[in-house]
Amino acid sequence: MSAQVSLELHHRISQFLFHEASLLDDWKFRDWLAQLDEEIRYTMRTTVNAQTRDRRKGVQPPTTWIFNDTKDQLERRIARLETGMAWAEEPPSRTRHLISNCQISETDIPNVFAVRVNYLLYRAQKERDETFYVGTRFDKVRRLEDDNWRLLERDIVLDQAVITSHNLSVLF
């Protein structure tokens, strides 16, 4: 990462991320989509456990995409959720997106900032189904001319190597 940002800029970007999390928790998916850049890259790969000796050699086991979405694909996912016919979200999940350890730095691209946050996503559904997703997100945010923000990239890294939930229909 490059140079760290000022406290004021850190606060503004953090507030953008907190607002984005509340939109997801409140099922305001269309408002959330409006926070995304047209060029959004929204990705998550499987997590694979590597032996220490392999990591020291720089060997990483192959992974598979869980998500590798564009804005159009995210819009289709949300349209499906809005139909009320998405079985994975009947009844709808109740979520809480918690983010912490927010580290923000400049990039080589003007008005684009790299953000690393740890997250905990709690999901409750039906009476007894509960799931915790924990990991790190690597985001890039773009500052617009009107001083608003857009999410340009989100790379989601799960700590869990085995996903025990019934599905991954929630947004991170």
UniProtKB/Swiss-Prot annotation:
Name of the top EC class for this enzyme: oxidoreductase
EC number of this enzyme: 1.14.12.19
Keyword Ligase recorded: no
Pathway annotation from the record: Aromatic compound metabolism; 3-phenylpropanoate degradation
Domain of life, source organism: Bacteria
GO MF term list: 3-phenylpropionate dioxygenase activity
InterPro entries in UniProt: 3PPDioc_HcaF, HcaF, NTF2-like_dom_sf, Rng_hydr_dOase-bsu
Any one cellular-component term (Gene Ontology): 3-phenylpropionate dioxygenase complex
Catalytic activity: 3-phenylpropanoate + NADH + O2 + H(+) = 3-(cis-5,6-dihydroxycyclohexa-1,3-dien-1-yl)propanoate + NAD(+); (E)-cinnamate + NADH + O2 + H(+) = (2E)-3-(cis-5,6-dihydroxycyclohexa-1,3-dien-1-yl)prop-2-enoate + NAD(+)
Keywords: Aromatic hydrocarbons catabolism, Dioxygenase, NAD, Oxidoreductase
Family assignment from sequence similarity: Belongs to the bacterial ring-hydroxylating dioxygenase beta subunit family.
Function: Part of the multicomponent 3-phenylpropionate dioxygenase. Converts 3-phenylpropionic acid (PP) and cinnamic acid (CI) into 3-phenylpropionate-dihydrodiol (PP-dihydrodiol) and cinnamic acid-dihydrodiol (CI-dihydrodiol), respectively.
Record's protein name: 3-phenylpropionate/cinnamic acid dioxygenase subunit beta
Gene from which this protein is expressed: hcaF
